[in-house]
Amino acid sequence: MPLLLLLLLLPSPLHPHPICEVSKVASHLEVNCDKRNLTALPPDLPKDTTILHLSENLLYTFSLATLMPYTRLTQLNLDRCELTKLQVDGTLPVLGTLDLSHNQLQSLPLLGQTLPALTVLDVSFNRLTSLPLGALRGLGELQELYLKGNELKTLPPGLLTPTPKLEKLSLANNNLTELPAGLLNGLENLDTLLLQENSLYTIPKGFFGSHLLPFAFLHGNPWLCNCEILYFRRWLQDNAENVYVWKQGVDVKAMTSNVASVQCDNSDKFPVYKYPGKGCPTLGDEGDTDLYDYYPEEDTEGDKVRATRTVVKFPTKAHTTPWGLFYSWSTASLDSQMPSSLHPTQESTKEQTTFPPRWTPNFTLHMESITFSKTPKSTTEPTPSPTTSEPVPEPAPNMTTLEPTPSPTTPEPTSEPAPSPTTPEPTSEPAPSPTTPEPTSEPAPSPTTPEPTPIPTIATSPTILVSATSLITPKSTFLTTTKPVSLLESTKKTIPELDQPPKLRGVLQGHLESSRNDPFLHPDFCCLLPLGFYVLGLFWLLFASVVLILLLSWVGHVKPQALDSGQGAALTTATQTTHLELQRGRQVTVPRAWLLFLRGSLPTFRSSLFLWVRPNGRVGPLVAGRRPSALSQGRGQDLLSTVSIRYSGHSL
């Protein structure tokens, strides 16, 4: 019998003690197998495990395929397991966190197909020396990547392109000497960047882009302060509150910013953000090394005028309307625009180009229009004057000629005053110089549809032919010159009359004439109308003031008289009799001796006597300190008129 009891107390071999600890928090089943000296995955794990800890074991090699039966697994910790190889086969569709830190991995396997839902990947403190270009392909949900404490020297461009949702990136404690310029491109959610304790000496231009980066750790690098560091210096100056020093075990939100921790290695630990940059190009110099924000470099040659060879064709007569400064410019190659013979109906290519207006001293011609359009048909063909190889200069005031340099790349034209327009020098090939027809037209109260023959123009140098309208004479005089002239701010847009049908022009002209004859639209009437309203308002204000003054003066004379006539009658006829009742059943006796001195008729009573009935039953006059009632306004006068009884706290 005792032996039987002993056998019952011994542990049953059918129910062995479990190797791992199992706990359940809410709906998550957590299995802890840490420090069990395991060399493989235990076989008796619950199938609904969501969190599995296998830290500090001796796994060496681990295959993710062994975890496929655990379809609800969301977190796997394999840190400090002496792993040298991780086999990725099978699929864990819901695994979100994988910790592989403090192992012996020399390469990072491709995890995209096996772990499509991975959000946190920690490969810190391994032996990684490089990363393949597609190491993170397929990890589109990744939010945190930790590569701290490896042996990385370079990173492939586009490494982080497959991870647009990345929020935290740790590359600290590596051997990085440089960073790809577009490493952070597309990472709109990135808020923490750890680059401390590397071998970085500079940051490429545009590296940070438009990222705010609330937490940046950049200390512990041998920053080389020279002209190439100016972009990084400017970024540090504008983000000084976002640069921190890493402290192990401290939350980044509890740290204090310290931009001075980023120091020059070649300037006796001088802070990079204070580097003066002496002798380096400044804003406007070549390179624009001090720019940032995507920090994109700006084009500083925007104010230079590029010399282009242009052929200009325009009608000899056009209807000009002041619609502002518009230019319809034809920019084409001289070789393509100069055939052996130009057809009169040749069309020009339209392209918008804007030239800054400039003032030309001693120049009385106003550049009214510059336009290029389709050549309209002509009804009257003006006969152009024949010209020779030398163009006949038109009589004109002094003009400023622009002589652009012959280089086709952004030369800057210089303005030289000349007493008169010069003639372009012909090239070795004989070419007809531009003619100067002077068609005379009516001052155009009613626009017609002239269709002059276009003048074939061939330029022999990079020049621009400009149509200038003179305002000296009422006639429209068009001067054609091969020298570019300065444009005034009062330039107007030219609309060819071909665009307006004759019927439409007649209707518009009729409306214009009727509007001129309308008396209500006359400018003098429009100016007199508000003046009339103003005078009418003044008269109305004056009339109202006089009426108000008369009313006030009448009220002042009438009111005192009414008061004087009514007050005497009220005083002579006012009589009052007061009946009092003692609510508490106590009579008040007035000694008759008080009225013995009266003889004859009774006088007019004008005063009152108040008797105070106290809570103890005593009756007496009003004592000092008590407020008189409204009936005692006339006390202290001749005789007694009425007797009022006052209880304690009441007035009758």
From Swiss-Prot:
**Membrane disposition:** Single-pass type I membrane protein
UniProt xrefs under InterPro entries: Cys-rich_flank_reg_C (IPR000483), Leu-rich_rpt (IPR001611), Leu-rich_rpt_typical-subtyp (IPR003591), LRR_dom_sf (IPR032675), LRRNT (IPR000372)
Outline the LRR repeats, range by range: 48-68, 72-93, 94-115, 117-137, 141-162, 165-186, 189-210
**Regions of this protein lying in the Extracellular compartment:** 17-531
In what residue span(s) does the LRRNT domain sit? 17-47
Key words, A-Z: Bernard Soulier syndrome, Blood coagulation, Cell adhesion, Disease variant, Disulfide bond, Glycoprotein, Hemostasis, Leucine-rich repeat, Membrane, Phosphoprotein, Repeat, Signal, Sulfation, Transmembrane, Transmembrane helix, von Willebrand disease
Q: Which GO terms describe its biological process?
A: blood coagulation; blood coagulation, intrinsic pathway; cell adhesion; cell morphogenesis; cell surface receptor signaling pathway; fibrinolysis; megakaryocyte development; platelet activation
Q: Which residues carry this modification: Phosphoserine?
A: S629, S632
Bias type Low complexity, positions: 371-391
| Annotated glycan sites | 37, 175, 308, 316, 320-321, 328, 331, 340-341, 345, 353-354, 360, 364, 369, 371, 373, 379-380, 383, 385, 387-389, 400-401, 405, 453, 457, 460-461, 463, 467, 469, 473, 477, 480-482, 486, 490-491, 494
Polar residues composition-biased segments: 336-355
Please give the residue ranges the record annotates as the region Disordered: 336-459
Q: Which segments does the topology annotation call Cytoplasmic? A: 553-652
- What range does the record give for the signal peptide? 1-16
Q: Mind telling me which GO cellular component terms the entry cites?
A: cell surface; external side of plasma membrane; extracellular exosome; extracellular matrix; extracellular space; glycoprotein Ib-IX-V complex; membrane; plasma membrane
UniProt-listed PROSITE patterns? LRR (PS51450)
User: What job does the chain carry out?
Assistant: GP-Ib, a surface membrane protein of platelets, participates in the formation of platelet plugs by binding to the A1 domain of vWF, which is already bound to the subendothelium.
- Clinical condition linked: Non-arteritic anterior ischemic optic neuropathy: An autosomal recessive ocular disease due to ischemic injury to the optic nerve. It usually affects the optic disk and leads to visual loss and optic disk swelling of a pallid nature. Visual loss is usually sudden, or over a few days at most and is usually permanent, with some recovery possibly occurring within the first weeks or months. Patients with small disks having smaller or non-existent cups have an anatomical predisposition for non-arteritic anterior ischemic optic neuropathy.
Q: What is this protein called?
A: Platelet glycoprotein Ib alpha chain
Q: Which gene encodes it?
A: GP1BA
